[in-house]
Amino acid sequence: HYEPLESAVKNLISSQQISPVIARWDEKAREKTCNPLIAEGCIAATFGSEEAKDFPIICTTYRVVEHWQTGQMTRWLPWLTEMVPHQFVEISEELAREKGITFGDKVRLTSARNIEGVEAYAMITKRLKPFVIQGKTYHMVGTTWHFGYKGLVTGAISNDLSPYIGDANTMIPEYKAFLVNVEKA
């Protein structure tokens, strides 16, 4: 088992924190994120790093049924865009209370690669709960990856927050677990 490149916790199963053979894509990506085991000057909130303190919240991305893939096709269809017209971030009631965020507030998600961040609407939910790992409480947020800069509805591109790395064997991107911060916009 390896933890994601950006993990809030220490890997207790293996002495190797992250995969030693993660894949990086283009030159731009190499400048923005890399494997701290093999390169200097990485911009990633790896466990125990200074960046990890600035981005304490675990983030995941997911789909909604109203949009397909990145939304390139479905963001042009009025009946679908009416159902999900805005980029949103799902936030637990506990984290919302801690941050002073209410349902419908515009919030900014930031990461080690995107300190300007992306904006989305807060969706306060009971579906997410804080969890305790190794004796410490962690929060998690979730956001979709269907929005972009074209279409009847547009919105922040969530993948602008995530690392440009993936599994070396399958090349599957590591968009499902990374660290962010969330604040009112």
Q: Where are each of the predicted segments found?
A:
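Long, contiguous, secondary-structure-rich segments that constitute the structural scaffold
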Residues: 3-27, 54, 63, 70, ...
